Swiss-Prot record:
Binds to 23S rRNA. Forms part of two intersubunit bridges in the 70S ribosome. CDD domains: Ribosomal_uL14. It comes from the Bacteria. HAMAP family: Ribosomal_uL14. Keywords: Ribonucleoprotein, Ribosomal protein, RNA-binding, rRNA-binding. One of its GO terms (cellular component) is cytosolic large ribosomal subunit. Part of the 50S ribosomal subunit. Forms a cluster with proteins L3 and L19. In the 70S ribosome, L14 and L19 interact and together make contacts with the 16S rRNA in bridges B5 and B8. It holds the Pfam family Ribosomal_L14. NCBIfam families: rplN_bact. InterPro entries: Ribosomal_uL14, Ribosomal_uL14_bac-type, Ribosomal_uL14_CS, Ribosomal_uL14_sf. One of its GO terms (biological process) is translation. This is Large ribosomal subunit protein uL14.
Length: 122
């Protein structure tokens, strides 16, 4: 569960290292985001020479959460960190590589490019 002010790691090679959620998209009173949801973030930490700089406002999709999520078969999937992938305007990833595992639920939300770039889909 990601809410406003939550810090997330970046799971791609855009140059950003840490993001802070500033808005959960999908309704005026929506408070929490889960895996597969799009959020608006501010870049809090970035490496020099990257595509994005510190202070940039970007959209990102949540790919891993500590809270985890319940699947239809009753099983749960949970990760060690909160992580997101920075998106372009057409919901394609801005980077060319994805680091770490991603959840299978991204396929249902039609983030097929992220699924294909990820080294592991759980």
């Amino acid at each position: 569960m990601i809410q406003v002010q939550t810090r997330l790691q970046v799971a791609d090679n855009t140059g950003a290292k840490e993001l802070m959620c500033i808005k959960v998209l999908g309704g005026s009173w929506r408070r929490y985001a889960n895996i597969g949801d799009v959020i608006v973030c501010s870049v809090k930490e970035a490496s020099p020479g990257g595509v994005v700089k510190k202070g940039d406002v970007v959209r990102a999709v949540v790919v891993r959460t500590k809270k985890g999520l319940r699947r239809e078969d009753g099983s749960y999937i949970r990760f060690d960190e909160n992580a997101a992938v920075i998106l372009k305007d057409d919901k394609e990833p801005r980077g060319t590589r994805i680091f770490g595992p991603v959840a299978r639920e991204l396929r249902d939300k039609e983030f097929m490019k992220i699924i294909s770039l990820a080294p592991e889909v759980l």
